[in-house]
């Protein structure tokens, strides 16, 4: 009986520690919130008069870098259409660009993800953008970049950030 009680207390402590590690990002100058799944994520740029969009890193910029942009689009534009437009007009000009696949994505806001690879300073980088539809004229683009191997390892964390992204 004593072992069961000790095991239960240890299990409860571990579950509480896991929940406590997750924080919610919110700022008065942005219209959204999302969960930050690990303390390794930190804001390097907060919104102010000069910068409208926050930026985050996972330890180091090469390990994981996140920018969030609000895209105002024509009525009826889908996240998939915006993803293809970004690829055609912006991403394909990156050095060593290799397009990835587009996948549907469900969270508090639904949309699509687009993955791609490119080269920066001789290193293979991975980009993964979540296009999340807020309404028929607003799509939020959560752009993650980092070294291919390192960003791939934290895919579950990028998914958590995108899944918990919601409007205030």
Question: Language-model segments: which ranges?
Answer:
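Conserved polar/disulfide-associated segments of primarily extracytoplasmic proteins
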Residues: 45-140
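Sec/Tat signal peptide C-region and signal peptidase I cleavage site
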Residues: 17-21
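Surface-exposed amphipathic alpha-helical segments
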Residues: 38-43, 139-168
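Soluble non-cytosolic domains of exported or imported proteins
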Residues: 31, 76-80, 148-156
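N-terminal "mature-domain start" segment
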Residues: 22-51
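Solvent-exposed coil/turn segments that connect beta secondary-structure elements
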Residues: 30, 39, 71-73, 119, ...
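Bacterial N-terminal signal peptides
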Residues: 7-16
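Positively charged n-region of N-terminal signal peptides that target proteins for export
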Residues: 1-4
């Amino acid at each position: 009986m004593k072992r069961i009680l000790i095991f239960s207390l240890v299990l409860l402590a571990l579950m509480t520690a896991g929940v406590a590690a997750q924080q919610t990002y919110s700022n008065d100058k942005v219209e959204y919130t999302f969960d930050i799944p690990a303390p390794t994520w930190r804001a390097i740029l907060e919104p102010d008069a000069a910068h409208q969009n926050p930026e985050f890193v996972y330890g180091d910029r090469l390990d994981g870098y996140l920018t969030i942009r609000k895209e105002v689009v024509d009525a009826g534009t889908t996240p998939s259409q915006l993803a293809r437009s970004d690829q055609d007009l912006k991403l394909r000009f990156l050095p060593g660009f290799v397009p990835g696949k587009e996948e549907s994505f469900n969270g508090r806001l639904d949309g699509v993800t687009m993955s791609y690879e490119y080269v920066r300073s001789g290193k293979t980088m991975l980009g993964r953008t979540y296009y999340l539809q807020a309404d028929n004229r607003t799509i939020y683009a959560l752009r993650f970049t980092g070294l291919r191997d390192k960003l791939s390892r934290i895919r579950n964390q990028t998914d958590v950030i995108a899944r918990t992204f919601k409007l205030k």
